[in-house]
């Protein structure tokens, strides 16, 4: 090959390489632009059940890094299909309960702006748990906190924070409410918010941040609801509401709600005589609630809800170790599954229990007359055997020298089973602590565990002498 041929060959090869590089750069540019725009787009299937990929979404799915020569492109994978929750997994097998969360709201109020609250509860969406409470329209270190022992005022609102975050000044006020319930159906939050005059209150149904439906008082006597989470199965949410006397017969209804719209209302049926402040949990294919009888029984009523045909069955927890306060001592107390026990039934406190085969797990105040201390245990045969009293796996959550209050259940879906958790309201201030003029609370939260656990006590812990008056 002569020199001229060599020059021509080298030039041709160089031109070919330059052309290839030029085409590669064009391909890289096109790919970059395409991926840049596609990271904000999702192709929606016919049922339109895909969440849009928009820059405002905080919770991302996965991120892939694609390397092309020296260019790095970040490509976001669109979120998975959003589906209704069906809660069809079995209940987790547990040996007891382990500590999960504590917000220390009252202790923090001694030196910070924390809301005055009561009636707290916990509920979870598919990815995260939140704490709720009914605020009193004031912080604790504020003269408006005087006389906040009252339950129903137009200033009360439903507060919502991530679990473990106290209700600070930046807390979202979800709705106006002096009674409430909240639950997530797998797609969005439903909030049931009751407010208004005692004799003509309104319940608002807020779904996905929008008011969808409402219902007025049907007995003109303090319309009220659960003060803990409702339950949604396959898009149908159930909430138990009562209107009427707190110490005689009242009118309880179970509302069935789909995306915020009331689709059916069933009256309470069965042998339960008085039902308030139910603590409900999914028991596929239905919903099961353990409630407060404020009239005749210190044994707790059970309400079983059929989500498919809207039928209702009610009875009472069989355990002779009863769950309400006030109550008789354990030697004298009784329950025979069907009817109220007529033992110190007038008055009571919100509480919880759940079935475990023929047995029952339950929590209650340690005090038989006062809302002091808190304990949990399992009663063998307590769900099916009348007046069963064999107690095992007892745990002290709050020692008897410290105050407690309401308690309730919430459910958390794991990979293979559904766990049951509970919270305890730790009330401080009036009526018992008269040095101060306010009434508020903090919470402590435990969840079921299949492991081992130790002992302890987790009271509110605030020194009332260090608190604002």
From Swiss-Prot:
Virion surface topological domain: 31-469
Subcellular location: Virion membrane; Host apical cell membrane
Domain notes: Intact N-terminus is essential for virion morphogenesis. Possesses two apical sorting signals, one in the ectodomain, which is likely to be a glycan, and the other in the transmembrane domain. The transmembrane domain also plays a role in lipid raft association.
Note in the entry: The influenza A genome consist of 8 RNA segments. Genetic variation of hemagglutinin and/or neuraminidase genes results in the emergence of new influenza strains. The mechanism of variation can be the result of point mutations or the result of genetic reassortment between segments of two different strains.
Cited InterPro entries: Glyco_hydro_34, Sialidase_Influenza_A/B, Sialidase_sf
Active site, per annotation: 151, 406
Pfam family for this entry, one: Neur
Post-translational modification (record): N-glycosylated.
Regulation affecting activity: Inhibited by the neuraminidase inhibitors zanamivir (Relenza) and oseltamivir (Tamiflu). These drugs interfere with the release of progeny virus from infected cells and are effective against all influenza strains. Resistance to neuraminidase inhibitors is quite rare.
Binding site residues for Ca(2+): 293, 297, 324
Gene Ontology MF term list: exo-alpha-sialidase activity; metal ion binding
Membrane topology reported for the UniProt record: Single-pass type II membrane protein
Keywords annotated in UniProt: Calcium, Disulfide bond, Glycoprotein, Glycosidase, Host cell membrane, Host membrane, Hydrolase, Membrane, Metal-binding, Signal-anchor, Transmembrane, Transmembrane helix, Virion
GO terms (BP aspect): carbohydrate metabolic process; viral budding from plasma membrane
Region feature (Involved in apical transport and lipid raft association): 11-33
Name the UniProt record assigns to this protein: Neuraminidase
Chain positions carrying an annotated carbohydrate: 61, 70, 86, 146, 200, 234, 402
Cofactor: Ca(2+)
Transmembrane segments: 10-30
Entry's EC annotation: 3.2.1.18
Catalytic activity as recorded in UniProt: Hydrolysis of alpha-(2->3)-, alpha-(2->6)-, alpha-(2->8)- glycosidic linkages of terminal sialic acid residues in oligosaccharides, glycoproteins, glycolipids, colominic acid and synthetic substrates
Function: Catalyzes the removal of terminal sialic acid residues from viral and cellular glycoconjugates. Cleaves off the terminal sialic acids on the glycosylated HA during virus budding to facilitate virus release. Additionally helps virus spread through the circulation by further removing sialic acids from the cell surface. These cleavages prevent self-aggregation and ensure the efficient spread of the progeny virus from cell to cell. Otherwise, infection would be limited to one round of replication.
Ranges of the Intravirion topological domain: 1-9
